[in-house]
A protein has these predicted regions:
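Active-site acidic/histidine proton-transfer and metal-coordination neighborhood
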Residues: 13, 17-27, 104-105, 117-223, ...
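Acidic (Asp/Glu)-rich catalytic clusters
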Residues: 24-30, 60-75, 87-110, 142-149, ...
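N-terminal small/glycine-rich loop or linker at the start of catalytic domains
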Residues: 31-50, 111-125, 157-163
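Active-site beta-loop-alpha junctions enriched in small/polar residues
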Residues: 38-40, 82-86, 110-115, 158-160, ...
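Glycine-rich, proline-tolerant flexible connector loops at the mouths of alpha/beta enzymes
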Residues: 50-54, 77-93, 163-164
Length: 408
């Protein structure tokens, strides 16, 4: 059965459920997912970097690849930059180059984890000189954001300690607040600071921004334009991420997402590949917040993945599509029935209401949306048939690989 016939069957079913199909399609067309520049370049683990033929080696090449994802999905028009990985001499020119590809430059991510000086921390380092270096880098990123037209500084710190007694918890907290206050004061309106947390790695005893409560505390101390960024891979196993999302929405402090998936830790697997039901439940809370007039939501939806074994552009297309699927399913939830079941204390019916939406095959719906947008209905198939991969392999070649360990 072709997608058109499958869509007719699905549309009839959804109409019978009382779904406003035009509204759902409109929401899907308006969905936006930002992709990361670093997701198009070679990456790996501390054990090995497996290089890929044709992988992007310059910022311009990363943007070229991101434009392919936008070309075949239609909802990924912005690209996050990582500084200094994406540092260039002329950001006005980079912005114009991106615009020429149909893209905009998105969140600016300071790198506060690779310099040798940051062994004991960056913004929390006990040495004031090194803290100054880290703060100055963040201030540089604010200037870069101004030049690129970005209104987001996305901040993740690797800062923490590995052993008891290594440093003062309260001393590091105070140093971090002092640094963040200087950064926040330098950010012009409406630029936002998104504070990302992670419960461990690379620090193993404690992490200075280890959980959502800590990130929220700092955001509340700074001001309304400081918010929390939720990375799906940055939680202990079993964490109820959708509850965290709901609480942050209710406090008007959910600033952004880094979509990815995990089996054990910060695995950076393709979003939706391991636990698609969790992703659906997260989108359920996001839609619930969007429908609440008492909540002011301005959420940056971003992917944060390093594709070590999958082809990078295909993996990114797959990731965007998986976000579309989760969002589409969540849009189909009968919210009136859900609320009635909750009020009646009917736990089974409440859960079944969610499952009815989750179990719906929304691929024909997404095919119809893409057709309306003038896109191919099968993004990965269309990309594979385009010849782009073969073209960049011939033009770019393959970089040399490396190991995470010396002399290996």
């Amino acid at each position: 059965m072709g997608w058109q016939k499958a869509y007719e069957v699905l549309a009839e079913d959804l109409a019978g459920r009382g779904v406003d199909i035009a509204s759902v399609k409109g929401s899907l067309k308006a969905q936006r997912i930002e992709t990361p520049s670093w997701g198009y370049a070679d990456s790996g683990t501390r054990f090995k970097v497996f290089t890929q033929p044709g992988a992007a080696q310059t910022t311009e090449q990363k943007l070229q690849d991101a434009a392919q994802v936008q070309k075949y999905t239609g909802i990924a028009p912005s690209v996050a930059l990582h500084i200094p990985w994406d540092k260039v001499d002329d950001y006005d020119a980079l912005r114009e180059y991106a615009e020429g590809l149909g893209l905009t430059l998105g969140a600016i991510n300071p790198n506060l984890f690779q310099d040798d000086e940051y062994k004991l921390g960056s913004l929390t380092h006990p040495n004031a000189k090194i803290r100054r270096q880290a703060i100055d880098h963040c201030l540089e990123c604010v200037e870069i954001a101004k030049a690129t037209g970005s209104d987001i500084i996305s901040l993740w710190l690797a800062d923490g300690t590995n052993y008891p007694g290594q440093d003062s918890f309260r001393g590091r907290k105070r140093r971090l607040l002092e640094a963040l206050e200087e950064l926040y004061a330098a950010m012009p309106e409406p630029m936002r600071l998104l504070i990302e947390y992670k419960f461990f790695e690379p620090a193993f005893y404690h992490t200075d921004l280890g959980d959502w409560g800590t990130a929220l505390m700092f955001a509340q101390k700074l001001g309304e334009r400081a918010q929390v960024l939720v990375d799906l891979g940055h939680h202990p196993l079993g964490t109820n991420i959708e509850q965290i999302v709901a609480y942050l929405i209710d406090e008007n402090r959910l600033g952004g997402f880094h979509f990815n998936s995990k089996k054990f830790a910060d695995d950076d697997l393709t979003v939706g590949s391991i636990n698609p039901y969790e992703l659906f439940l997260i989108f359920n809370e996001l839609i619930d917040g969007e429908l609440d007039p008492s909540v002011d939501m301005d959420v940056a939806y971003m992917i944060d993945q390093s594709h070590n074994v999958k082809p990078k552009i295909e993996a990114m297309i797959q990731s965007v599509v998986n976000c579309q699927v989760a969002y589409a399913r969540a849009l189909l939830i009968d919210r009136e029935a859900l609320q009635n079941a909750r009020l009646a204390g009917d736990i089974v019916l409440a859960e079944e209401t969610l499952l009815n939406a989750f179990r719906t095959d929304v691929r024909p719906l997404l095919a119809a949306v893409r057709s309306d947008m003038g896109l191919d209905v099968d993004p990965i198939k269309a990309y594979r048939a385009s010849g782009y991969y073969e073209k960049v392999v011939a033009e770019r070649g393959q970089a040399s690989g490396s190991s995470g360990y010396p002399e290996a």
